[in-house]
Amino acid sequence: MKFFALFIYRPVATILLSVAITLCGILGFRMLPVAPLPQVDFPVIMVSASLPGASPETMASSVATPLERSLGRIAGVSEMTSSSSLGSTRIILQFDFDRDINGAARDVQAAINAAQSLLPSGMPSRPTYRKANPSDAPIMILTLTSDTYSQGELYDFASTQLAPTISQIDGVGDVDVGGSSLPAVRVGLNPQALFNQGVSLDDVRTAISNANVRKPQGALEDGTHRWQIQTNDELKTAAEYQPLIIHYNNGGAVRLGDVATVTDSVQDVRNAGMTNAKPAILLMIRKLPEANIIQTVDSIRAKLPELQETIPAAIDLQIAQDRSPTIRASLEEVEQTLIISVALVILVVFLFLRSGRATIIPAVAVPVSLIGTFAAMYLCGFSLNNLSLMALTIATGFVVDDAIVVLENIARHLEAGMKPLQAALQGTREVGFTVLSMSLSLVAVFLPLLLMGGLPGRLLREFAVTLSVAIVISLLVSLTLTPMMCGWMLKASKPREQKRLRGFGRMLVALQQGYGKSLKWVLNHTRLVGVVLLGTIALNIWLYISIPKTFFPEQDTGVLMGGIQADQSISFQAMRGKLQDFMKIIRDDPAVDNVTGFTGGSRVNSGMMFITLKPRDERSETAQQIIDRLRVKLAKEPGANLFLMAVQDIRVGGRQSNASYQYTLLSDDLAALREWEPKIRKKLATLPELADVNSDQQDNGAEMNLVYDRDTMARLGIDVQAANSLLNNAFGQRQISTIYQPMNQYKVVMEVDPRYTQDISALEKMFVINNEGKAIPLSYFAKWQPANAPLSVNHQGLSAASTISFNLPTGKSLSDASAAIDRAMTQLGVPSTVRGSFAGTAQVFQETMNSQVILIIAAIATVYIVLGILYESYVHPLTILSTLPSAGVGALLALELFNAPFSLIALIGIMLLIGIVKKNAIMMVDFALEAQRHGNLTPQEAIFQACLLRFRPIMMTTLAALFGALPLVLSGGDGSELRQPLGITIVGGLVMSQLLTLYTTPVVYLFFDRLRLRFSRKPKQTVTE
């Protein structure tokens, strides 16, 4: 009593306290960062190593395995995967959430150093690492195009000037430059001309290397001067290499231009990048795992004018893709939904109270509670994201509940003629414990979420804390500001209501009277109600088992990512054509705004595409519908597949795959894995629950296998090293010399001119100079035949691995796909030597599925304990919790009706319903107990009176919560796929709960009261109407 009086009789202090809460919230709001979702990125580090010319199998055994053994000893590594292709190895380390990325990076460097002695001596450089996840979609893609500069020159500007500067921006983890390679002088040799002149490829290589050197020459001094010695020992352009003398034949000089075509070109001609229909260089920017995407993008944009000034005016620097606009639009949609929810909730209060003065009170209490929450969010290091703003949207219905309960009870006393200040004090005292019980039990629902580990726990923690803080502030406001405003603003007389609102008042009275009559009938047919209650419990179990489930709703971020997978023996020229064909098909779609793509590098048969869709208000289809439409058109392209998926804000794991979900096959027997992977992949491709099934196992690449006749080689005076050197010189794009420039270093690349290597007959033109100086054709001592060879070798841990990726067809859920895969594996009879398990997001889904029921049970148990402590009773908490089954049925039926799978967002809705619907029972039970203790009423009379007395606040609080969630259901635009499942769950649960709990709660109350009397051996009371 004294606590409430302190605030009611000191209005100035109470107002200033509320102003202080509001000001702190405004300051917190201004300092909060903006993000699509809470920070849930796993710390990921990528280790790269290269050994030019080495086969994938050689890279896997000699480079990947030693590094894996050393890196695998690092503490906190949750997953280690590697992929080895021609000349390169990439190892992805995913760490536990609580592992500091900088500390992990130091451990990675130490592990690389420890493995250095086990690595091949021919590696051109030590392995390097980057603190970025290569499987993440870029947060921004910049393109460089020009009608004046070549692709190599553009690449030079990008890699030398732009990429280093952008990498230094806070939040940037990696800048990957694609579409070409650095400028180089390329020497394309003519095999026939070399043969005619008696010059070997090694002779050419040695001559070029000796002609381009950079060594210190020293200095000259006399008594007073010093001269630095400088020579023309470096050749920098193709024109300078053209007249280079490489050999003398019969006294005549053989110049490089006589046996080769020398051009200013690029290091690797097997690279191509495009934006829309124009050749381009791509800068793909990824953020650090812990970085904020909006802040990072804003920092990059602020730097762009300065970057533009560092490159020539003839180069066009454009933003081809930016992830931030859809994120900002999504948050704006949530903010609008929040405002609409507040307005609707206040409208509900006005309709029920039919008083402008009374409506002002919750209209003040709600903003104070919500705005004050921002201060706590800032102190907790949270951000303004879809989940935290949804928490505040839902909180509008909660925070007004407390004010409604207090306000309605005070208004009831005023209508009975009590003076305002006395009514405020008395009314608050009567419901103070009720409000405390409702708020604390609601906060208790989220305690299990705070203790939940892994990605789901990290994802839901911000939502739970934000909502809990809003409820606690609301509790404080409802017991201080609300009664003070009631005492000083409301009048003792019955409020005059407008004529147009009288109809609503009469309707409410009629509803209350009808409810009273129906409740009397129900209390005389309690067994029927008990059967209904048991039926809802059984229906809950059946619906939960049968409803489709997924991890997280599929988002429409306005960005698609595509992976091209072509025939494993495809040439680069053909692959570049496939890239152009696919880009044209996508560019012609009316929903597409921009397309960028690239191909080449160590995997010639693959490529990547990034598609920016038009804003949501300019297209009628969702991202998934656009993918479905494009899939039909893309399937007509022969010899290659383009797999599209919508970029998501949550992507787990470091595997680069062509689809959203992964299923990994592991084996210590590589032959068994290669035997069973095609069988499993083909089986999964037939399943209607899966789409875009593909695999990263590529072991059918075309290979030309040369077999040396060592006896013949010995007789001809040729060794294996000379033969291998010949092949490397001819076909390996061998970097034979370095050109030093002030800003960068460039290579001289030697190979047989591509004009002479268009078919296998090119091998017949190759020759080796033996130890007697004679030219010996390769065909004299070697035979060759085509064979198959892997294009890549993949590991997980230290086991051979193959990852099958898949998307979900429209109308199918991840639980459908998971069950179908499990059935297929059983039907195939896969041996125990090949192990299958879900990976990435699918793995987290499996783990979440196993913990969902436990989480719900834990939440219910926590609420029971809190209520038991508050009521000092084992029985009354059970009465209150009996409201939950009907809410669960309503929520699950609503999800089924809207064809929405049960996701992590829907789970949040279920947890919220546990907190919401029990409020009705708390109000009933509190007043029933009070009537029994002080009114000398029987249990049936007490609960009947409590139900009628609390009918109006129950309807008000339920409708406030329902109208607070309704905008989430009806909202469209960016991010609606996240908001709608939450709104559907809450609205469905509230509607069903409101229909049933008004009747089931009184029946359960009487049942437990009889049970209590029976066990306490007290005389059974007679129930009367």
Swiss-Prot record:
Record's GO cellular component terms: plasma membrane
Subcellular location: Cell inner membrane
Keyword Repeat: no
Pfam families: ACR_tran
Signal peptide: none
Induction comment: The mdtABC operon is transcriptionally activated by BaeR.
Residues annotated as transmembrane: 3-23, 333-353, 360-380, 387-407, 431-451, 463-483, 528-548, 853-873, 875-895, 897-917, 953-973, 984-1004
Membrane topology: Multi-pass membrane protein
Presence of keyword Cell membrane: yes
Gene Ontology MF: a single term: xenobiotic transmembrane transporter activity
Keywords linked to the UniProt accession: Cell inner membrane, Cell membrane, Membrane, Transmembrane, Transmembrane helix, Transport
PANTHER family: MULTIDRUG RESISTANCE PROTEIN MDTC, PTHR32063
Functional description taken from the UniProt entry: The MdtABC tripartite complex confers resistance against novobiocin and deoxycholate.
HAMAP family cross-referenced by the UniProt entry: MdtC (MF_01424)
Subunit description: Part of a tripartite efflux system composed of MdtA, MdtB and MdtC. MdtC forms a heteromultimer with MdtB.
Family: Belongs to the resistance-nodulation-cell division (RND) (TC 2.A.6) family. MdtC subfamily.
Full protein name: Multidrug resistance protein MdtC
